C-alpha cells in the first residue's frame, strides 16, 4: 500500500513528489481528465495485513492442533473479506490537493483498468474481494 504520488517529466526524466494520497492504497484504478487525476477504489490492506500475519503465525507454529485452528481462522478471514475500498478521490494538479468524491455504491473493483471516453469512464470487471472477480462494468460520469 502506498500513499506517495510521483510526477515524471517525460522529456527530462525528472521525478517530483506531489501531495500524498489521503490514505495508502494499492491496486485501484483511475483516469486523467481536465487537470485532475481520478483514483477509483483500491485496497487499503486491512484484510491483507491480517491474512499475512496469520500465515506467518501458521508457519511458526509447531503444534499441529493449534496450526489447524490458525489455518481455519486465516481461511475465515479470506472467505469473509469485506471487499475493497469504494472511496474515490480526485487530485487537482493546479492546486496540488486531494478532493474526496462520492463513493461507489456497492463493491469497487481492483486489479483492472479504467477507460475514459469524453467525461464518461468505464471500469470493466476486476476483483471485488480477494480472489473474487466480477463481470460487472461500472459506468460513471465526471461532472
Residue ranges and their predicted role:
Residues 1-143:
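Kelch-like beta-propeller repeat domains
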Amino acid at each position: 500500500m502506498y500513499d506517495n504520488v510521483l510526477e515524471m517529466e517525460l522529456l527530462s526524466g525528472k521525478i517530483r513528489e506531489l501531495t500524498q494520497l489521503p490514505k495508502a492504497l494499492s491496486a485501484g484504478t483511475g483516469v486523467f481528465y481536465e487537470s485532475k487525476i481520478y483514483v477509483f477504489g483500491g485496497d487499503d490492506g486491512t484484510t491483507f495485513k491480517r491474512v499475512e500475519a496469520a500465515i506467518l503465525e501458521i508457519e511458526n507454529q509447531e503444534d499441529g492442533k493449534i496450526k489447524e485452528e490458525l489455518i481455519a481462522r486465516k481461511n475465515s478471514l479470506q472467505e469473509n473479506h469485506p471487499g475493497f475500498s469504494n472511496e474515490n478521490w480526485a487530485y487537482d494538479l493546479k492546486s496540488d490537493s486531494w478532493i474526496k468524491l462520492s463513493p461507489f455504491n456497492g463493491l469497487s473493483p481492483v486489479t483492472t483498468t479504467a477507460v475514459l471516453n469524453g467525461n464518461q469512464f468505464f471500469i470493466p470487471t476486476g476483483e471485488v474481494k480477494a480472489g473474487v472477480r466480477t463481470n460487472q462494468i461500472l459506468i460513471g460520469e465526471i461532472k
